[in-house]
C-alpha cells in the first residue's frame, strides 16, 4: 500500500548558500556602497541590519531572490513586522518555518478528506502521513497540498510502494 509523508522543512545547506550569495550581492551593489549593512545567519535565524528601514526591506528582497534561486521556497520565511531601531541601525530578524503546526495539519487533513480521494491521512508529530491504494491518488494529494493556499511550503518524502 503506497504511503508518503507531507513535511515542511528548509534545506540547511541551501539556506546557508542563499545567505552567502546575498552577502556577496550586498557587497557588490552600488546603492549599498559606503553604507553600514549586513546579513548574518545564526541558529536558523537570519539577521538583516542596515542604516534605515527602507534598506532593511531591500535586504529582505535580496534574500528572497537568492532563496528562490537556490530552490528554497520564500514562503517559509517569517519576517518580523517592524524593524528594531538601535543606535543608528535598523535590524530585522527572519525566521524559517520548520514542521507543520497542528492547526495547519488539521486544515490539510480536512482538505484531503473533503477531496473525496481514496486515501487515509493522519497527523504524526510535525508531519502528515498519507496512505492510499494507488500511487495516482498520492500524486493527486501532492497537487492538492501544493494548491491548498495554507501559507506554508510542503515537501513530500518517504514515498513507499
Swiss-Prot record:
The keyword Nucleotide-binding applies. Pfam families: DUF520 (PF04461). GO terms for molecular function: nucleotide binding. The keyword Nucleotide-binding applies. CDD domains: YajQ_like (cd11740). GO terms for cellular component: cytosol. Belongs to the YajQ family. Nucleotide-binding protein. This is Nucleotide-binding protein Swoo_3646.
